[in-house]
């Protein structure tokens, strides 16, 4: 395990790390706090596979991998996966689960900025899902992801839009009414409008290729992808060719 001790460590919110450390042991409980992540993971994975043209035998980095839900599923698709996170306990859980399931992948405790300094233009695909709204400087993360991916490579981001509807759905609804995630999981002030995210992307060699919303219907208890990006959304970007 490698631990980052560089100045880029400053782009870490210790309170956010502590929140996820406290519940890390239940990361792979399909009925626990991370049930929504397990439910949406097939949608995320299918989107990544379709937009990137497949990831078999490709080098893939999952930034903010947590306990490894997405990272492990990408490794099972035949990718050479590295999971990156600053939470010690989630990474321990991820390593143990990979060992139990016989899934081959690597986990590193390091900031994405530090990793980018060491591995520029190394990965074919970079994913950064449900992470940007948990760091002090999301633009710095986007710049690092752009640095990490090869020319013509793919970078995927997902986060939550910032508006009244997203606050009602992602905070009031998900945390307090439906109790899908623990109270305090999200800070609505840290949500990111698509225009902001794409603005940061445009300041890098990345170019936006596609954007799609992730929708939850509480009546049918069903998740699906769609064009509306009012709440959760994913963005597919691609680095300019050399």
Swiss-Prot record:
EC number: 2.1.1.222, 2.1.1.64
Family to which this protein belongs: Belongs to the methyltransferase superfamily. UbiG/COQ3 family.
Pathway(s) this gene product operates in, as recorded in its UniProt entry: Cofactor biosynthesis; ubiquinone biosynthesis
One Gene Ontology biological process: methylation
Protein name stated in the entry: Ubiquinone biosynthesis O-methyltransferase
Known function: O-methyltransferase that catalyzes the 2 O-methylation steps in the ubiquinone biosynthetic pathway.
Keywords noted in UniProt: Methyltransferase, S-adenosyl-L-methionine, Transferase, Ubiquinone biosynthesis
Catalyzed reaction equations: a 3-demethylubiquinol + S-adenosyl-L-methionine = a ubiquinol + S-adenosyl-L-homocysteine + H(+); a 3-(all-trans-polyprenyl)benzene-1,2-diol + S-adenosyl-L-methionine = a 2-methoxy-6-(all-trans-polyprenyl)phenol + S-adenosyl-L-homocysteine + H(+)
Gene: ubiG
Pfam families cross-referenced by the UniProt entry: Methyltransf_23
Binding site for S-adenosyl-L-methionine: 44, 64, 85, 129
Listed Gene3D superfamilies: Vaccinia Virus protein VP39
GO molecular function, one term: 2-polyprenyl-6-hydroxyphenol methylase activity
TM helices/strands, residue ranges: none
Natural source organism: Yersinia enterocolitica serotype O:8 / biotype 1B (strain NCTC 13174 / 8081)
Disulphide-bridged cysteine pairs: none
InterPro entries: SAM-dependent_MTases_sf, UbiG_MeTrfase
């Amino acid at each position: 395990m490698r631990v980052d001790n560089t100045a880029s460590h400053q782009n870490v919110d210790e309170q956010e790390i502590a929140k996820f450390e406290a519940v890390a042991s239940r990361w792979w409980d399909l009925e626990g706090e991370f049930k929504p992540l397990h439910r949406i993971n097939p949608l995320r994975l299918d989107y990544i596979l379709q937009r990137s043209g497949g990831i078999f035998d490709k080098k893939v980095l999952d930034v903010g991998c947590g306990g490894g839900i997405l990272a492990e599923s990408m490794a099972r698709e035949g990718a050479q996966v590295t999971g990156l996170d600053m939470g010690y306990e989630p990474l321990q859980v991820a390593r143990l689960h990979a060992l139990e399931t016989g899934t081959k992948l690597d986990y590193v405790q390091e900031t994405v900025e530090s990793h980018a300094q060491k591995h520029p233009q190394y990965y074919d695909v970079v994913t950064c899902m449900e992470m940007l709204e948990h760091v002090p400087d999301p633009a710095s993360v986007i710049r690092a992801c752009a640095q990490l991916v090869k020319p013509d490579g793919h970078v995927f981001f997902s986060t939550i839009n910032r508006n009244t509807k997203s606050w009602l759905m992602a905070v009031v609804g998900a945390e307090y009414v439906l109790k899908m995630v623990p109270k305090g999981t999200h800070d609505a002030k840290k949500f990111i409008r698509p225009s902001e995210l794409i603005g940061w992307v445009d300041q890098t060699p990345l170019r936006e290729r596609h954007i799609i919303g992730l929708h939850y219907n509480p009546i049918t208890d069903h998740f699906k992808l769609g064009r509306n990006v009012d709440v959760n959304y994913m963005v597919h970007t691609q680095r300019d060719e050399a």
